Swiss-Prot record:
Keywords of the record: Calcium, Disulfide bond, Glycoprotein, Glycosidase, Host cell membrane, Host membrane, Hydrolase, Membrane, Metal-binding, Signal-anchor, Transmembrane, Transmembrane helix, Virion
UniProt region (Involved in apical transport and lipid raft association), positions on chain: 11-33
Binding residue positions for Ca(2+): D291, G295, D322
Cofactor(s) required, per the database record: Ca(2+)
Name of the gene: NA
Start and end residues of each stretch annotated as Hypervariable stalk region: 36-85
Name of the protein in its database record: Neuraminidase
Organism field: Influenza A virus (strain A/Equine/Cor/16/1974 H7N7)
Subcellular location(s) per record: Virion membrane; Host apical cell membrane
Region (Head of neuraminidase): 88-469
Length: 469
């Protein structure tokens, strides 16, 4: 075949292919037009439109059927604000729900040095919160961690029952004093940082900085070292500024979404307030605090969360629960501190004032931070002559204890009442064990109430401190 024949043959093939493509295109166009026309004729028969409003999390499904429009709205409820509508459960004994054994693990693991731990819950779980020292136990920076206030401290949270490590701890905020609570929707946290005479409290809501509070007495602004409490979107916090051994200046501060909505200076007969352990019930908040100036009996603050008002006084019983403390008294005081030697300085503690089911916690030793016991004292909050009815040992007196405080899982739907819970800090190292180590840290145990009587047992820290030498 000569070149001209090849050219004509190729052109013929190209023309045939082009015609075939054209016919295919025409048939496709006809099919699309037909389908579109059928779709248009039935378009209004059954159309579903879904609108999601992210703010209110409301889904609206609109069904169009011929000429009738039917709206069906389904509200997807966010967890609502916590309402303190229940009373405290009756308790017949206490059971351990968590023990992290942090110091025992710390002999070989990289456990973070902490103090001032506490427990706080949200709708999903309960966690431990603690103020770290910016180091681990086996790190040389752990030397001299007896100091309460340094620039290296900050609040962390860890799963309850797990010792705090770098990998399992979540950073919350910088500071050397703290409180934190959940309002049912988001968590509010306060940390105090800076110089003793010029400190600042930072307030966070949903992990975002919302406001700050500057010292008002220029003498170690400080707060609870345990959880605050919220009701109907308002969270209440007790803060103190001023001397630890003289008249100080305490405020009860109310927050909404991390913003201050009201402040009250301390009212009532309490002479000195520090490190309150608070719990909610019956639309009220009760705080059991520390009088570091005079009283071996604990002051209490009672807060009406509807009126946003408070008053203060002392636990009435003559059974004293601060450390150091003199011997128990036959008759207590409701409106004045009970003094005596040994007295100051005091320790953070707690109690659950529930009429004839009242329980108070204290160290077993009246002088040292050792041992821990729970005492059932009916009507201790109101009766100066109330006496110990039951006693449960938590930590034997030959083991170190420390701070203690209250917490409640307000979102436990298995109960029609709030089950009281508490934790005990188990301090190890300096100052009591200074001949072995240069650091101060702690482990933690947490306990909750049982509706029936329980057995016995002691739950100390359990670490052999000489292994760290």
């Amino acid at each position: 075949m000569n070149p001209n024949q090849k050219l004509f043959a190729s052109s013929g093939i190209a023309i045939v292919l082009g015609i075939i493509n054209l016919l295919i295109g025409i048939s496709n166009m006809s099919l699309n037009i037909s389908l579109y026309s059928k779709g248009e004729s039935h378009k209004n028969n059954n159309l579903t439109c879904t609108n999601i409003n992210q703010n209110d999390t409301t889904m609206v499904n609109t069904y169009i059927n011929n000429a009738t429009i039917i709206d069906k709205s389904t509200k997807i409820e966010n967890p609502g604000y916590l309402l303190l509508n229940k009373s405290l459960c009756n308790v017949e004994g206490w059971v351990v729900i968590a023990k992290d054994n942090a110091i025992r693990f710390g002999e070989s693991e990289q456990i973070i040095v902490t103090r001032e731990p506490y427990v706080s819950c949200d709708p999903l779980s309960c966690k431990m919160y603690a103020l770290h020292q910016g180091t681990t136990i086996r790190n040389k920076h752990s030397n001299s961690t007896t100091h309460d206030r340094t620039a290296f401290r900050g609040l962390i949270s860890t799963p309850l029952g797990s010792p705090p490590t770098v990998s399992n701890s979540e950073f919350i905020c910088v500071g050397w004093s703290s409180t934190s609570c959940h309002d049912g929707v988001n968590r509010m946290t306060i940390c105090v940082q800076g110089d003793n005479e010029n400190a600042t409290a930072t307030v966070y809501y949903n992990k975002r900085l919302t406001t700050t509070i500057k010292t008002w007495a220029k003498n170690i602004l400080r707060t609870q070292e345990s959880e605050c409490v919220c009701h109907n979107s308002t969270c209440v916090v007790v803060m103190t500024d001023g001397p630890a051994n003289n008249q100080a200046f305490t405020k009860v501060i109310y927050f909404h979404k991390g913003m201050i909505i009201k402040e009250e200076s301390l009212k009532g007969s309490a002479k000195h307030i520090e490190e309150c352990s608070c719990y909610g019930h019956n639309q009220r908040v009760t705080c059991v605090c520390r009088d570091n100036w005079q009283g071996a009996n604990r002051p209490i603050i009672e807060i009406d969360m509807n009126k946003l008002e408070h008053t203060s006084r002392y636990i009435c019983t003559g059974v004293l629960t601060d450390t150091s403390r003199p011997k128990d008294k036959t008759i207590g005081e409701c409106f004045n501190p009970i003094t005596g030697s040994p007295g100051a300085p005091g320790i953070k503690g707690f109690g659950f004032l529930n009429e004839d089911n009242t329980w108070l916690g204290r160290t077993i030793s009246p002088r040292l931070r050792s041992g821990f016991e729970m005492l059932k004292i009916p009507n201790a909050g109101t009766d100066p002559e109330s006496k110990i009815k039951e006693r449960q040992e938590i930590v034997s007196n030959d083991n170190w204890s420390g701070y203690s405080g209250s917490f409640i899982d307000y979102w436990n739907d298995n109960s029609e009442c709030y089950n009281p819970c508490f934790y005990v800090e188990l301090i190890r190292g300096r100052p009591e064990e200074a001949k072995y180590v240069e650091w101060t840290s702690n482990s933690l145990i947490a306990l909750c109430g049982s509706p029936i009587s329980v057995g016995s047992g002691s739950f100390p820290d359990g670490a052999q401190i000489k292994y760290f030498s």
